[in-house]
A protein has these predicted regions:
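Amphipathic alpha-helical segments typified by the pilin-like N-terminal helix
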Residues: 1-13
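Periplasmic/extracellular, small/polar-rich flexible segments of pilin-like filament-forming proteins
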Residues: 19-111
Length: 111
């Protein structure tokens, strides 16, 4: 469905965006996530910055932003959490019910 595909795309774009923004600190920039966060990048700063700067809407609930600080799997949400100072966990559910096949996960390192 279009909602499933939209959620899968958001998951991939979120991982790509966070990774690219963290890289800015490695390249000597003073800020990342626009000017929302100061370098050096930590997992917590990356989560906060992504939630503050990404405005994608949840395709299942368009009044809500899809990118959020959470560990939960709920349809249409890309949940971000700092596992430790250097690891960001990304948990996404693409379809109502969130069966195992409908869950996407990724980890991003700030190192």
């Amino acid at each position: 469905s279009a909602k499933v595909n939209a959620t899968k795309t958001m998951h991939a774009q979120t991982v790509k965006y966070i990774s690219a923004e963290i890289q800015k600190c490695s390249l000597g920039e003073a800020n990342f996530m626009g000017t929302d966060q100061d370098c050096p990048a930590t997992a917590a700063k990356a989560v906060t910055g992504a939630v503050n700067t990404m405005n994608d809407k949840n395709p299942y609930s368009t009044a809500n932003k899809a990118i959020r600080s959470s560990t939960a799997f709920n349809e249409g949400y890309v949940s971000l959490s700092a596992t430790n100072t250097t690891t960001i966990q990304v948990n996404t559910c693409t379809k109502t019910g969130c069966a195992t096949a409908d869950k996407m996960t990724a980890t991003i390192s700030t190192d």
